[in-house]
Amino acid sequence: MNKRTRCLVAGTALLIGVSMALALILTAPQSARAAGTVRYAAPNGLTTGNCDGSWANACTLQRALAVAVSGDEIWVKEGVHYPGATRTAAFALKNGVAVYGGFAGTETQRSQRNWQTHRTILSGDIDKNDITDGGVVTTTANIKGSNAYHVISSTNVISTAVLDGFFITAGQANGSWPHSDGGGMYNYKNSSPTLMNLTFSGNAAAKGGGMLNNNGSSPTLMSVTFISNTATANGGGMLNYLNSSPVLTNVTFSGNSAVNGGGMFNNIGNPTLTNVTFSGNSADSGGGMYNVESSPTLMGVTLSSNKANGDGGGMFNDYSDLTLTNVTFSGNSAEYGGGMCNAHSNPTLTSVTFISNTAIASGGGIFNYDDSRPTLAEVTFSGNSADYGGGMSNENSSPTLTNVTFRGNSAVTNGGGMDNYADSRPTLTNVTFSANTADYGGGMSNENSSPTLINVTFIRNTAGNAGGMFNESYSNPTLMNVTFSSNSAIADGGGMYNHLSSSPVLTDVTFSGNSAGKGGGMYNNNVCTPTLVNVIVWGNNAATGPEFLNNNSTPRISYSDIRGCGGSGSWNSACGTNGGGNIDADPRFVNASAGNLRLLPTSPCIDAGKNGAVPAGITTDLDGRPRFADVPFVPDTGNGTSPIVDMGAYEAQYRYRVFLPLVVRNR
């Protein structure tokens, strides 16, 4: 076990069970149903008859369901309705039958109902001794005695089975299977009812406290709320199992709890979520959502203030490859992965925000381990915190990041923005680390890890050591088109600190305006041999070694501009090994004090680099402009065939116009 070994929560394939579902809806689709009879139900209705004609003939809801046939509607009067007298009783949905709540008991048209004003409650409190708020159980601790195992059930029904406008409460699935699952609703064997305008409150089960969907059950949920439901195992709000793929739109999971998946638990389930909120849910792992061998799709989803005692405050993924677009993780907390935790998982994140999430151990925003390889594009990490990796922590994992920002994240120990550990090899393109803080590696920390950085900016990061980047224990990152500016360290390495046989390779990198006690630009300690080609180190500050400082380390430097190293003609061997082509001259930045590290037309760094050092496939600079651009009238002092690459992260793009004199001749 290493010093930061994670413990994978019990249960990567833990779920056998039957499923339950809950939902809230607006109006049911009518074109798919043939016109039929309107049947009426009331809390103290008749137990015989056809329940039709008028409200005067209203039956119990159980009776109305029994006599209804495909094409019928059941209008249900406000009040509390119970499924029967025994624990196995449940309201069973039927194909082609639409059940509507929210009636006062006088309406002649369905459009006259108001399900929010006229609360229609389906309750499992068959012994009528629960503590309720107007008939609704608001916490499962208020369930007393023995309630119905399932308030609602469906087996092999399709979308024409409709439930619309109800509170579902007080289900208590604490028996043996199948009565252990789906306290509020239990959907089984390819059941896919339509569920609208529903609130599931105070239901309990071993699995799927609010709803359980099992064996290909894929209900459609619109305007549904799951609140204060609990599961002693998995899925406090909802559990989806064995190819169950419900579709959720405008759904809220709030205050639900479980051992795993406080809001939702998916095991071989692939739900689609649009405009869904997970808020204030809790679990040992996966406070908001827990996925096992599942591939849910999330669009416009918010996970906020969810909590996990172990992994994944907002979400935990195990062997799962989900897709997230326009998703926000905010204020979630856990031991590992405050926002998201991935184990053996490869989610795709696009336009996702992680803000103010916290982890006690690693990964305030995201924690990746066990060879996880998520893909992130247009993602922002802001204000997240952890012991290791305030924004992101990777353990033996290699995510791919494009157009990502780490801003204002913090770590107590390593990696304010990102911490890489145990042979992690992330790839970063067009990434910015700004104003992150840590003890080691304000922007990034690498331990026995070798990320690849292309077009990356480190600016105004702070640390005790290594303001911008910390590399230790055989870490060999590759950097191309990277800037380190205005980073600071109290002790060593304002821009970069390399320690214990770490040898990064830097090509077209600029260090300027960084500060530290020792090694303002770069500090190399304990047998480090970094390679620098086409690099500028100028205008940094430290009491000892303002630009560059080596302790028992020998960098290899060529075609670079390092202040104080003398250039290749009068090389200072304390700087490292002279590979030729080096200069020691003011690079003439456009405005270094303002952070503009582009080159003025008179810069000696223009056309002074080495073409052969630029890796294949790198054709642009940090601005996205051509990497090889010739500036007319500037001598090529570098190595290669014109156009010669510039030193530093930015390629000068100047062009000159030649104006010929105007000659006027008289005729």
Question: Which residue ranges define each predicted feature?
Answer:
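Predominantly extracellular beta-rich ligand-binding scaffolds that present long acidic/polar faces
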Residues: 73-78, 83-98, 107-117, 194, ...
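Residue-level detector of buried hydrophobic side-chain packing
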Residues: 41, 64, 74-76, 99, ...
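Sec-dependent, cleavable N-terminal signal peptides
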Residues: 1-36
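Low-complexity, Pro/Thr/Ser/Gly/Ala-rich linker/spacer regions in secreted
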Residues: 28-37, 650-667
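Extracellular repeat-rich scaffold modules on cell surfaces
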Residues: 154, 162-170, 177-203, 483, ...
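Right-handed parallel beta-helix/beta-spiral solenoid domain characteristic of secreted/periplasmic
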Residues: 97-177, 581-592
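C-terminal accessory segments
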Residues: 128-141, 145-149, 153-156, 579-651
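Acidic Gly/Asp/Thr-rich repetitive segments characteristic of extracellular carbohydrate-active
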Residues: 43-77, 81-83, 90
